[in-house]
Regions:
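DG-centered beta-turn motif at the end of beta-strands
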Residues: 24, 47-49, 89, 139-143, ...
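Alpha-helical transmembrane signal-anchor/signal-peptide segments
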Residues: 32-50
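Short beta-strand-loop
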Residues: 86-119, 142-143, 273
Length: 322
């Protein structure tokens, strides 16, 4: 018996093949265990006001509109989210945010969510002004109507129209409900004119500095100009209103509502900031070990064909004797 055991020990090929067979059997059994995993719910809010049509965002080496960039980066974020995460898509205009649906699971509904983002259009606006600050209260109210709580990822350039002053600045001192909301800044800090389009999405000029109806972010058809749209545009390049990503304001707003800000130019930074947002709930996730045991089965199967002496002889054949 001892001699038989010694014989087996000396036969490395038999040992490797046996181990490969054992691991293969275990892989077929597919042992599993469960572990707790944080699950997140989100609402991606995309600013669709006209200032988001400013072409100062860089995508694949060319300048595109802020809205197009916001849609692209939000789709890239969506691709990185793990299964069981739930996402809703919201649109911001005026003083409020409209959700297309309550948060739905990303893997089962990826195509639907992706298409929703793709179809976002500035012509869907329902109000003519852009009051980002005032939208905080309405957004918190919207989230409270969801079946489950959701974290906010807000894609915007920070443009307020009309500009904030003492009489129209919303008091957020008592505001609650925005903890850890993430503001993603879209655009650049170089002044760029805001294009003005007609209702067929044809360029007719640029927003001017003077005309109230053409203030940055004001939509063509709104409560301010219902009954007719002002087609006036800036008469000269010097008269064009220059729009910029207002990072200073977005950082200040984020701090005021106990949220966070990140520049939208870096996908990794956005994902990193999202990981810091608290999860909505914890779930039992099943972890399968089949792939691990299959790997070891393959490894030991391959090892039976190799030995140190065989490797040395192969090296000698290739490179010659040293």
């Amino acid at each position: 018996m001892d001699e038989y055991i010694k014989k087996i020990k000396g036969n490395k090929n038999f040992i490797y093949l046996s181990l490969a067979f054992i691991f293969l059997i275990i892989a077929f059994i597919n042992p599993k265990f469960t572990m707790k995993k944080d699950i997140s719910n989100y609402i991606f809010v995309v600013d669709i006001t006209q200032s988001m049509l400013t072409q100062d965002a860089l995508l694949n080496g060319e300048k595109v509109s802020r809205l197009k960039y916001a849609k692209d980066i939000s789709q890239k974020v969506l691709e990185q989210l793990p299964c069981k995460t739930k996402v809703s898509i919201g649109m911001f205009a005026g003083v409020s945010v409209a959700a297309t649906y309550t948060p739905i699971e990303v893997c089962e509904n990826f195509s639907a969510i992706n298409e929703t983002i793709e179809r976002l259009d500035w012509r869907s606006v329902w109000a003519g002004n852009t009051r980002l600050r005032a939208s905080m209260i309405n957004l918190a109210r919207l989230i409270r109507s969801f079946p489950e709580s959701a974290q906010v990822v807000y894609f915007t350039d920070g443009e307020e129209a009309p500009k904030l002053h003492a009489f129209n600045t919303e008091d957020l001192n008592q505001f609650q409900g925005a903890n850890n909301w993430l503001f993603v800044g879209i655009g650049s800090d170089e002044g760029t004119p805001i294009p003005k389009y007609d209702n067929k999405n044809q360029l007719i000029g640029y927003w001017s500095n003077e005309s109230f109806a053409l203030q940055p972010g004001v939509a063509q058809i709104s409560a301010q100009n219902a009954g007719g749209r002002d087609n006036n545009v800036s008469n000269a390049s010097y008269d064009r209103y220059l729009s910029r990503l207002d990072e200073k304001y977005l950082k200040s707003l984020a701090q005021e509502v106990k949220g966070n800000y990140v520049n939208g130019s870096d996908l990794k930074e956005i994902l990193s900031a999202m990981k810091k947002q608290p999860s909505a709930w914890r779930d039992d996730t099943e972890v399968q070990l089949r792939n691990i045991f299959s790997f070891f089965a393959l490894l030991f199967f391959i090892m039976q064909f190799f030995s140190i002496n065989r490797v040395k002889s192969l090296l000698k054949i290739k490179y010659g004797k040293s």
